[in-house]
């Protein structure tokens, strides 16, 4: 059953008023694949547009806070924490973005985590596209989530081998 449709098939916001208030956490991931030279410049902080990684972290945090403004029918949530980690994986020529979002509330924070990772990836693309137009944003997904009536979730995808 699709919970965002009423009995007449019209879209509506799900009523979460009767759900228990619990601790919620979700992690999402996005990878940005690029040319090795681009990754080197980015990690060294030598791209013309400035500190790409710091800007991407801020953009991801801002995006998580604005999720309900951008995703129809998404509940506005009182986020207690948004963290953005960006890891370089030279062997795969990519940056991996992992967002972690927490709140105490009646509904999960998966969309906020996905929004944070996605916008951080888009920011990296925007700031590095002058030197690498062939970048690819890939592997955007919820890694895990905790809290709520449906219990915990761990995505079955195996993380990339990070050995160099």
Curated annotation (Swiss-Prot):
Substrate binds at residues 73-75, 111-112. The keyword Lyase applies. SUPFAM superfamilies: Molybdenum cofactor biosynthesis protein C, MoaC (SSF55040). It catalyses: (8S)-3',8-cyclo-7,8-dihydroguanosine 5'-triphosphate = cyclic pyranopterin phosphate + diphosphate. It is an enzyme of class 4 (lyase). The active site is at 126. Coiled coil: none annotated. InterPro entries: MoaC, MoaC_bact/euk, MoaC_sf, MoCo_biosynth_MoaA/MoaC, Mopterin_CF_biosynth-C_dom. Keywords: Lyase, Molybdenum cofactor biosynthesis. GO terms for biological process: Mo-molybdopterin cofactor biosynthetic process. This is Cyclic pyranopterin monophosphate synthase. It comes from Herpetosiphon aurantiacus (strain ATCC 23779 / DSM 785 / 114-95). The lineage of its organism: Bacteria, Bacillati, Chloroflexota, Chloroflexia, Herpetosiphonales. The gene is moaC.
């Amino acid at each position: 059953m699709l919970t965002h449709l009423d009995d007449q098939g019209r879209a509506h916001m799900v009523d979460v008023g009767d759900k228990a208030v619990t601790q919620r956490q979700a992690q999402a991931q996005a990878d940005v694949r690029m040319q090795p030279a681009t990754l080197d410049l980015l990690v060294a902080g030598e791209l013309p547009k400035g500190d790409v990684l710091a800007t991407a972290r801020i953009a991801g945090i801002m995006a998580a806070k604005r999720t309900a403004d951008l995703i129809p029918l998404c509940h506005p949530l009182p986020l207690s924490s948004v963290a953005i980690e960006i890891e370089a994986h030279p062997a795969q020529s990519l940056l991996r973005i992992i967002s972690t979002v927490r709140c105490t509330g009646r509904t999960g924070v998966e969309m906020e985590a996905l929004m944070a990772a996605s916008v951080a990836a888009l920011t990296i693309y925007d700031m590095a596209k002058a030197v690498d137009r062939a970048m690819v944003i890939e592997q955007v997904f919820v890694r895990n989530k905790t809290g709520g009536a449906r219990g915990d979730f761990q995505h079955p995808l195996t993380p990339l081998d990070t050995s160099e």
